[in-house]
């Protein structure tokens, strides 16, 4: 049976149209599958990536005040209630440097990779080198700690800055442990001191209700920032160094112009003391941790609160963005560390392992590890697996 030319053309045209329609149907089906599959894939991926404890260090008999990785990720810096500053190799966790304080002298002890004492040097208040093993130097003297409450690295990792309980701030050589400068000016207890991203300036906070900006090279005070009505507990520069954000016991956060010292905004929302506050690495957001058991995410430009993260059952002592800005890590008195999705505020993981209040938790520079310190003197290293 033969078809007419007209019927044949109609058949071919219909077949061609049907083929095109099938392609569209398959495309639509594929997009629908992809639409529903991506969230599950993302959730599965997030569930697979969790932090597990790879090292527990009994660093002190007392509370850990601060712990962090060096900017290059090679070392670990910590300060405990015993006021000793310690650095360790991040690969084998052996002690590298310990800075102590004698009644009249600062003593730094450096260690080999195997943990043996390699060098011990002593300086007096005028930075003159002394022999710590000389009986005339330390005879009948009791060793005290470096008197430090917290400590952090300079951006280049060459210096360590620590705050002392007598209201002073000290800059140390990160390799030798030598005391380089003492910054004096606060009239009360100093809570924190941090370098600017360029390393040229230092911002400090105090119970005298002020922030101070210092010249990191000369140690001179450049500005005193006033505005908080209670103890200023923490301050941090923005990634571009143009702004400073501060947290206070007055339950507020303030954003300052780092150049003029002018208060640009006051962020209100927490109902209790704000313990720490930091910018996201991209500089667009601010994260804060409070005694009201919450973490808040703020728009750094408008100052509006974008999200409130709830989940901890007690005070939240610290919160920090991951280097890629995708996650936030928090530490709490409830003995847990939590990992949050910085975009939607969901809790991705609750890390348990500490047996006492977790004071601090911070990411490594590459974001694959977290270092945490607790009230019982334990430091833990968590790695993403």
Please annotate each region the language model reported.
Residues 71-72, 113-114, 155-156, 197-198, ...:
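Residue-level detector of Asp-centered blade-edge/turn motifs that repeat once per structural unit
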Residues 359-385:
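Blade-level signature of beta-propeller repeat domains, shared across WD40, Kelch, NHL, RCC1
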Residues 76, 118-120, 160, 202, ...:
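Hydrophobic beta-strand positions that form the internal "hydrophobic ladder"
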Residues 82-84, 125, 166-168, 208-211, ...:
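Short coil/turn segments within WD40 beta-propeller repeats
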Residues 46-61, 138-140:
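A short helix->beta-strand "capping" segment at the edge of beta-propeller domains
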């Amino acid at each position: 049976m033969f078809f007419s030319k007209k019927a044949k053309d109609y058949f071919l045209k219909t077949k061609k149209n049907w083929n095109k329609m099938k392609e569209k149907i398959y495309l639509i089906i594929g997009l629908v599958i992809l639409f529903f599959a991506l969230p599950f894939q993302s959730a599965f991926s997030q569930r697979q990536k969790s932090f597990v404890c790879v090292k527990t260090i009994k660093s002190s008999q007392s509370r850990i005040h601060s712990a962090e990785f060096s900017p290059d990720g090679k070392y670990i810096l910590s300060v405990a209630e015993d006021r000793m500053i310690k650095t360790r190799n991040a690969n084998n966790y052996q002690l590298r440097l310990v800075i102590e304080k004698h009644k009249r002298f600062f003593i730094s002890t450096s260690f080999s990779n195997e943990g043996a004492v390699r060098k011990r040097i002593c300086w007096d208040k005028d930075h003159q080198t002394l022999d710590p093993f000389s009986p005339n130097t330390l005879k009948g003297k009791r060793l005290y700690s470096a008197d430090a409450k917290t400590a952090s690295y300079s951006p280049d990792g060459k210096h360590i800055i620590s705050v002392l309980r007598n209201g002073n701030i000290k800059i140390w050589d990160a390799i030798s442990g030598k005391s380089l400068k003492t910054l004096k000016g606060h009239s009360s207890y100093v809570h924190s001191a941090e370098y600017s991203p360029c390393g040229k300036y230092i911002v400090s906070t105090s119970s005298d209700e002020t922030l101070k900006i210092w010249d990191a090279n000369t140690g001179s005070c450049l500005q005193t920032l006033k505005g908080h009505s209670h103890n200023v507990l923490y301050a941090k520069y923005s990634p571009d160094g143009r702004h400073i954000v501060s947290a206070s016991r007055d339950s507020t956060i303030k954003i300052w112009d780092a150049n003029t010292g002018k208060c640009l905004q006051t962020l209100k929302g927490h109902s209790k003391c704000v313990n720490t506050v930091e910018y996201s690495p991209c500089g667009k957001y601010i994260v804060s941790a409070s005694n009201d058991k919450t973490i808040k995410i703020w728009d750094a430009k408008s100052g509006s609160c974008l999200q409130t993260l709830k989940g901890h059952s007690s005070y939240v002592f610290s919160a920090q963005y991951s280097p890629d800005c995708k996650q936030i890590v928090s530490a709490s008195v409830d003995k847990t560390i939590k990992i949050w999705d910085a975009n939607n505020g969901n809790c991705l993981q609750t890390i348990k392992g500490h047996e006492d209040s977790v004071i601090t938790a911070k990411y490594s520079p590459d974001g694959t590890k977290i270092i945490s310190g607790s009230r019982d003197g334990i430091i833990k290293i968590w790695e993403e697996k």
